[in-house]
Amino acid sequence: MQKDRAAYDEMYELIRPVVKAKTVLELATGTGLIAKHIVNAAAHIEATDASAEMIAEAKRDNRSAKLHFSVQDMFCLPYADKSFDVVIVSNALHIVPQPEKALAEIHRVLKDEGALIAPTFTHAGNSFFGKAKAFFMKLAGFPLHSRWTGEE
């Protein structure tokens, strides 16, 4: 667990300068951990999730007027074209059934010079433990749908 926490702490440190004074959309926010850890750097964050239960949990200890949580469908967002400077979608694109549809919607709401931040902590490709983790994720209902390389 300490290793996971250290990875997330490092991720927050890397994200903060990118979102500094920017409008941010976070998709698949879950309990809102990323949004809550970076909100002080951003101008405003819209943090969304498909799960009403997750959003209710995220709202429980939100004390920032710059952070708004709502239930939204990442495939059909209610925001105007080119609304956000930064879109964050962490640990989600590899498990959605149509990642290309989600990416098209992200592209629509992201400003022309905007940034997409999409960290995914899954598994190390062809290692034994990576393959085992992918197998058990599939059994749990979270199959790996797509892989992207730097060129893509």
What are these model-derived regions, one by one?
Residues 3-22:
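Conserved alpha-helix/loop element of class I SAM-dependent methyltransferases that forms part
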Residues 15, 38, 106:
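Class I S-adenosylmethionine-dependent transferase superfamily signal
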Residues 25-27, 31-76:
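Class I SAM-dependent methyltransferase SAM/SAH-binding core
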Residues 88:
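A conserved beta-strand element that flanks and buttresses the S-adenosyl-L-methionine
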Residues 91-92:
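Short catalytic micro-motifs in class I SAM-dependent methyltransferases
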Residues 100-112:
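A short glycine-rich, Lys/Arg-flanked "PGG" loop and its adjoining helix->strand segment in the class I
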Residues 115-144:
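Conserved class I S-adenosyl-L-methionine
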Residues 145-152:
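Short alpha-helix
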